[in-house]
From Swiss-Prot:
It comes from Chlorobaculum tepidum (strain ATCC 49652 / DSM 12025 / NBRC 103806 / TLS). Binds 1 Fe(2+) ion. This is Peptide deformylase. Fe cation binds at C94, H136, H140. The lineage of its organism: Bacteria, Pseudomonadati, Chlorobiota, Chlorobiia, Chlorobiales. It catalyses: N-terminal N-formyl-L-methionyl-[peptide] + H2O = N-terminal L-methionyl-[peptide] + formate. NCBIfam families: pept_deformyl, PRK00150.1-3.
């Protein structure tokens, strides 16, 4: 099932998500739906708060990027960044902020402690694009969007577009929670 995506200014995106205590059939179903939703949008990462679940759960698949064609889809539960290295500036976008992109400075490499879809613990190093995608998605779990990390001057330049999203005046090629909720209210 394709889940509607919550957009900029939705309260769930500003909350610190709750850790998972384990993986049961409901979480397995949510993981599958998150992958379906991410692929349909299309995106390369999706955090549970983006689909209305305040849980520390992320799915990532960067194999659509040529240099990462061999990458295997990844489920990240209860992630915690334990070390950072380097620094890089790159343009980011987000399914929760449709139609907007902006430059964000982030560490270029991270060491991450997390659990997988079987709730097994891992500690691994990630660099380059994967480090960036993981940090972007982990930000969602902490109530932060990439626009919150943009330079203040750049952020001011996109404020009208952000206001339009907050007011529901935005279209996307994937279902938005605000549109779904509006249709349900009218029914």
């Amino acid at each position: 099932m394709i889940l509607p995506i919550n957009t900029y200014s939705d309260p769930v995106l500003a909350m610190k998500a709750k850790p998972l205590k384990g993986v049961d059939s409901a979480i397995e179903e949510l993981i599958a739906e998150m992958f379906d939703t991410m692929y349909k949008a299309p995106g390369i990462g999706l955090a549970a708060p983006q689909v209305g679940h305040s849980l520390r759960l992320v799915v990532v698949d960067i194999s659509t990027i040529k240099e990462y064609a061999d990458f295997k889809p990844m489920v990240v539960i209860n992630p915690r960044i334990v070390a950072v290295r380097g620094r890089s500036l790159m343009e980011e976008g987000c399914l929760s902020v449709p139609g907007i992109a902006g430059n964000v400075v982030r560490p270029s490499a991270i060491t991450l402690h997390y659990r997988d879809e079987k709730f097994e613990e891992h500690t691994a190093d990630f660099h380059s694009m994967m480090a960036r995608v993981l940090q972007h998605e982990i930000d969602h779990l902490d109530g932060t969007l990439f626009v919150d990390r943009m330079d203040k001057r750049d952020r001011r330049k996109i404020q009208k577009e952000l206001d339009a999203i907050a007011e529901g005046r935005v279209k996307a090629d994937y279902p938005l929670a605000r549109d779904v909720n509006r249709v349900e209210a009218e029914a």
